[in-house]
């Protein structure tokens, strides 16, 4: 191997090195705060402290009245959004009218907050659907809806904004829609009451989860990453796979999986690990589209990887009424299957391309062992969750522990300025999550009160004649369509409202149903035509976004199959006896292996098309819930592997050994 091919990560990109080793204090949030006017910085700093103290008080001291703490949480999020994203900066023309608009939004948010705080006690005695909305209440409700929708437009997406508009239009003009989805409509005062006071409205369970759980975990994740933990996870993934077949691609899988356990954000994972792994993959011999697809698929898996999954998983626990630890435990096997499939896939692609163990492209980072203690906060968090500690308290204590751990080394020790910046970053992320959870309340309130969910359940039952597979297929397609336009949290919440009752009506448990819907909401991030994680990775790789999207879709095929598998085999989600769970584990691993080999087109040797199809067929047979299908699947798996191994001996010189 020539010296020219020897590559060091330190020469790849200064930003990538900073992300891996946390040597660069001038982070994105630091730059953002540095460039904003001082009055906005100080205002945000004060709001950050107030919001943090409030959140600590309600968990460590005593909870407040729900009509006090929920609106306060919502309004603090709104004001934070207005200050971080002023319209005067977003617009091309710096018209003073935009300042007036921003001031109006801040003032109206404060007015909404004042209304609820001053009427919190009386609202506890208000009878929903009986007491008439006063003029003041209608005005407050209108302002609340306007603020939430404008916040969605600024920090979430225009897609979600237009979806909300569609639901509002349906609420008002439902009586003019022909067919099954026609209903009498909701009067304007009634609609405002539903959205502001209804248990399925803006202050419903999604926002309750944002207040009671998500805020604390988002702040913890920010501190854990900025205190050195994130860098250790990335470096660990890179080191574990260095000097192996397809090492950089495996590094992307491992690093993104490890980082995803903390962040739970596909795009954030791509942006963080992709700047390291994608250039390395390209230099090793992977095509730009392959490199980008591997990174986007691996990063998307972070939302389904315990212990800290996507925000939707916390909301799922709230909806089902179970401990989050149960959700996380149930998600382990599907997550392992997902990452195992991607890991095997990149290995087989490397073998097919003839890439050896020593490609000359190596990662040179700091030693891992001297820094491994920085992972203690995440280890302690997992232990506390398993031991039954409440999620908020666990996150609070582990956040404090992260700061203490960071103080051990001068490299990660947090100055007061960096401490404030990190806290402000965590609060900013909390605000950006609170907004879509509140927005989902608008849509859920309309769906529930218009009877759409019942009608969809009836439609599924009629069209599929009670067929579970048809119901699952319709729900999966609906989730994918929603997930293409909406964030995972919003897609999951709407899909659960629309499809869950129909699936559960066919005898499927709440946990399995919700996990099925959640999975498809997640993989929509890498499903064309709208696949934001894939597009982000394609931008880093300089690859075709369209080709990357389809490549990622094919690489992640396991994620589209596993949800059907755990519906028919609930033992995959730990719903069954010990024997059933062990069998499910073995079956899933075997099916995952065959799927990965079929997609890569390699099993001991390059596969012909009919051999790849045989791998797919046997993998699908494994999903069927019967002893006969297990026997046929195992026999088929053994035959395929034996045949490919024996015939592969003739071509042994075409690929290097593992």
Name what the model sees in each region.
Residues 220-225, 256-265, 297-303, 444, ...:
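Transmembrane alpha-helix interface/packing and boundary motifs in multi-pass membrane proteins
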Residues 100-106, 111-113, 121-125, 132-133, ...:
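Hydrophobic or amphipathic alpha-helical targeting/insertion segments
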Residues 111, 150, 155, 163-180, ...:
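Core transmembrane alpha-helical segments of multi-pass membrane transporters/permeases
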Residues 1-131, 138-142:
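Conserved, well-structured core domains of diverse proteins
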Residues 31, 58-62, 83-96, 143-158, ...:
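Membrane-water interface regions at transmembrane-helix termini and the short interhelical loops
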Residues 234-302, 308, 312-315, 321, ...:
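Hydrophobic transmembrane alpha-helices that form the pore/transport pathway of multi-pass ion
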Residues 134-139, 200-213, 239-253, 284-290, ...:
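Membrane-interfacial loop-to-helix junctions in multi-pass transporters
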Residues 2-44, 329-429, 532-620, 648-658:
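Long, contiguous bundles of hydrophobic transmembrane helices that form the permeation core
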């Amino acid at each position: 191997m020539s010296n020219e091919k020897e590559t060091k990560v330190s020469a790849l990109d200064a930003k990538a090195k900073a992300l891996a080793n946390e040597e660069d204090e001038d982070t994105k949030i630091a730059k953002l705060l540095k460039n904003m006017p001082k009055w906005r910085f100080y205002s945000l700093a004060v709001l950050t402290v107030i919001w943090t103290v409030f959140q600590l008080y309600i968990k460590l001291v005593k909870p407040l009245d729900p009509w006090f703490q929920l609106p306060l949480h919502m309004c603090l999020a709104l004001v934070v959004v207005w200050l971080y994203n002023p319209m005067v900066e977003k617009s091309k023309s710096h018209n003073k009218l935009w300042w007036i608009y921003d001031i109006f939004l801040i003032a109206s948010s404060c007015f909404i907050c004042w209304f609820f705080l001053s009427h919190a006690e009386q609202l506890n005695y208000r009878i929903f659907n009986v007491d008439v909305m006063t003029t003041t209440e209608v005005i407050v409700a209108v302002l609340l809806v306007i603020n939430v929708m404008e916040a969605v437009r600024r920090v979430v997406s225009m897609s979600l904004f237009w979806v909300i508009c569609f639901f509002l239009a349906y609420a008002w003009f439902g009586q003019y829609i022909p067919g099954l989805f026609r209903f009498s409509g909701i009067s304007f005062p009634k609609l405002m009451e539903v959205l502001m006071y209804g248990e399925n409205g803006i202050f419903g369970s999604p926002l309750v989860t944002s207040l009671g759980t998500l805020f604390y975990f988002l702040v913890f994740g920010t501190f854990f990453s900025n205190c050195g933990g994130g860098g250790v996870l990335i470096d660990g993934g890179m080191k574990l796979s260095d000097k192996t077949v397809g090492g950089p691609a495996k590094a992307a899988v491992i690093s993104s999986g490890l980082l995803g356990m903390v962040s739970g954000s596909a795009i954030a994972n791509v942006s963080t690990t992709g700047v390291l792994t994608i250039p390395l993959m390209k230099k090793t011999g992977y095509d730009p589209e392959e490199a980008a697809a591997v990174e986007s698929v691996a990063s998307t898996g972070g939302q389904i990887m315990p212990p800290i999954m996507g925000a939707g998983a916390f909301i799922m626990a709230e909806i089902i009424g179970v401990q989050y630890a149960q959700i996380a435990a149930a998600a382990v096997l599907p997550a392992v299957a997902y990452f195992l499939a991607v890991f095997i896939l990149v290995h087989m692609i490397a073998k097919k391309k003839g890439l050896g163990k020593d490609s000359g492209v190596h990662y040179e980072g700091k030693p891992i062992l001297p820094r491994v203690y920085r992972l203690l906060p995440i280890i302690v968090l997992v232990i506390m969750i398993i031991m039954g500690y409440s999620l908020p308290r666990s996150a609070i204590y582990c956040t404090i522990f992260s700061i203490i751990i960071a103080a051990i080394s001068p490299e990660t020790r947090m100055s007061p300025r960096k401490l404030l910046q990190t806290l402000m970053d965590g609060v900013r992320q909390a605000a950006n999550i609170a907004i879509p959870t509140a927005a989902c309340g608008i849509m859920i309130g309309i769906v529930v009160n218009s009877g759409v969910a019942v009608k969809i359940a009836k439609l599924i039952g009629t069209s599929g004649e009670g067929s579970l597979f048809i119901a699952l297929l319709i729900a999966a397609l609906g989730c994918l369509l929603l997930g293409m336009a909406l964030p995972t949290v919003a897609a999951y919440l709407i899909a659960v409202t629309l499809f869950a009752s129909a699936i559960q009506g066919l005898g499927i448990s709440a946990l399995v149903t919700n996990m099925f819907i959640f999975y498809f909401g997640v993989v929509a991030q890498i499903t064309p035509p709208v696949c934001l994680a894939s597009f982000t990775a394609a931008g880093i790789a300089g690859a075709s976004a369209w080709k990357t999207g389809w490549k990622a879709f094919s690489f992640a095929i396991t994620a589209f199959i596993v949800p059907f598998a755990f519906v028919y085999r609930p033992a995959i989600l730990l719903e069954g006896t010990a024997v059933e769970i062990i069998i499910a584990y073995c079956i899933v691993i075997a099916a995952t292996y065959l799927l990965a080999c079929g997609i890569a087109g390699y099993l001991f040797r390059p596969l012909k098309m009919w051999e790849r199809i045989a791998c797919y067929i046997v993998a699908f047979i494994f999903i069927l819930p019967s002893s006969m299908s297990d026997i046929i699947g195992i026999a088929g798996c053994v035959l395929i592997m034996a045949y490919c191994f024996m015939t592969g001996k003739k071509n042994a010189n075409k690929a290097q050994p593992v």
